[in-house]
Amino acid sequence: MITRNYETLYIIRPDVGEEQLEQTISQFRTFLEEQGATKLKVQNRGKRRFAYPIKKLREGYYILMTYTAPGTAIAPLERAMRLNENILRFMTIVLEEETETEDAEEENPVLARA
């Protein structure tokens, strides 16, 4: 099974309690682990103000998850987020593989014209 690096950012309603916030975060962490995700890192970015109202709310808790998982794990995760009433928005992106572009740039420096 091919695994890729993913990053999922989701926003939780601001009116949830601290206990329910932690419960929601651990729910999705456990869900990904059950789907075979590895190298899972979860960052609580805290409560932030939106640029525009989302579902009549002006702020929310931003949670960022970075992980390696098979492609089949993403659709069930996003479906679970869509069905969870505490999640306002979510987005999953595929992270590019780490390349050695910095080393390549050093080997072929760009010459400036005089």
UniProtKB/Swiss-Prot annotation:
Gene3D superfamilies: 3.30.70.60. Keywords: Ribonucleoprotein, Ribosomal protein, RNA-binding, rRNA-binding. GO terms for biological process: translation. GO terms for molecular function: small ribosomal subunit rRNA binding; structural constituent of ribosome. Pfam families: Ribosomal_S6. Signal peptide: none annotated. GO terms for cellular component: cytoplasm; ribonucleoprotein complex; ribosome. NCBIfam families: S6. Binds together with bS18 to 16S ribosomal RNA. Belongs to the bacterial ribosomal protein bS6 family. This is Small ribosomal subunit protein bS6.
